[in-house]
Curated annotation (Swiss-Prot):
<dbReference type="Pfam" id="PF00298">
    <property type="entry name" value="Ribosomal_L11"/>
</dbReference>
<dbReference type="InterPro" id="IPR020784">
    <property type="entry name" value="Ribosomal_uL11_N"/>
</dbReference>
<protein>
    <recommendedName>
        <fullName>Large ribosomal subunit protein uL11</fullName>
    </recommendedName>
</protein>
<keyword id="KW-0687">Ribonucleoprotein</keyword>
<dbReference type="InterPro" id="IPR006519">
    <property type="entry name" value="Ribosomal_uL11_bac-typ"/>
</dbReference>
<dbReference type="GO" id="GO:0003735">
    <property type="term" value="F:structural constituent of ribosome"/>
</dbReference>
<comment type="subunit">
    <text>Part of the ribosomal stalk of the 50S ribosomal subunit. Interacts with L10 and the large rRNA to form the base of the stalk. L10 forms an elongated spine to which L12 dimers bind in a sequential fashion forming a multimeric L10(L12)X complex.</text>
</comment>
<keyword id="KW-0699">rRNA-binding</keyword>
<dbReference type="GO" id="GO:0006412">
    <property type="term" value="P:translation"/>
</dbReference>
<dbReference type="InterPro" id="IPR036769">
    <property type="entry name" value="Ribosomal_uL11_C_sf"/>
</dbReference>
<dbReference type="Pfam" id="PF03946">
    <property type="entry name" value="Ribosomal_L11_N"/>
</dbReference>
<keyword id="KW-0689">Ribosomal protein</keyword>
<dbReference type="InterPro" id="IPR036796">
    <property type="entry name" value="Ribosomal_uL11_N_sf"/>
</dbReference>
<comment type="function">
    <text>Forms part of the ribosomal stalk which helps the ribosome interact with GTP-bound translation factors.</text>
</comment>
<dbReference type="InterPro" id="IPR020785">
    <property type="entry name" value="Ribosomal_uL11_CS"/>
</dbReference>
<keyword id="KW-0694">RNA-binding</keyword>
<comment type="similarity">
    <text>Belongs to the universal ribosomal protein uL11 family.</text>
</comment>
Length: 141
């Protein structure tokens, strides 16, 4: 018989830098999960993606064991890295803080495709383009 899931926890953590301090400790501690075991596994699985924020979905079971799935970095993080900017514009309609080209947009779309609710790279590119526009990043050809 399959183990019963008691909780699903979603966190966004720096790749390779998870530690028992907040937000990891309190989120996992209240469900009785071994925090250090999670931190070691997460850091080992994400060490090659250093510098990115990696979302993780942790399933906690009745016997206090857990499994987790790492997702792709948020589109906004990938866009800021590609545009070489610190952060997006506070007022996207007024300010243009940077730009990325179509090749960079396609690369980001291919990276995000497994986590997006679409099947083609073209539709993923439109989703990422909308995110970039809302951040004040323009798309150049």
């Amino acid at each position: 018989m399959a183990k019963k899931v008691t909780a699903v926890i979603k966190l966004a953590l720096q790749a390779g830098k998870a530690n028992p301090a907040p937000p990891v400790g309190p989120a996992l501690g209240q469900h009785g999960v071994n925090i250090m075991m999670f931190c070691k596994e997460y850091n080992a699985r994400t060490q090659d993606k250093a510098g990115f924020v990696i979302p993780v979905e942790i399933s906690v079971y009745e016997d206090r064991s857990f499994t987790f799935i790492t997702k792709t970095p948020p589109a906004s993080v990938l866009i800021t890295k590609a545009a070489k900017i610190e952060k997006g514009s506070g007022e996207s309609a007024k300010g243009n803080v940077g730009s990325i080209n179509r090749a960079q947009l396609e690369e980001i779309a291919k990276t995000k495709l497994p986590d997006l609710n679409c099947t083609s790279v073209e539709s993923a590119m439109r989703i990422i383009e909308g995110t970039a526009r809302n951040m004040g990043v323009s798309i150049s050809d």
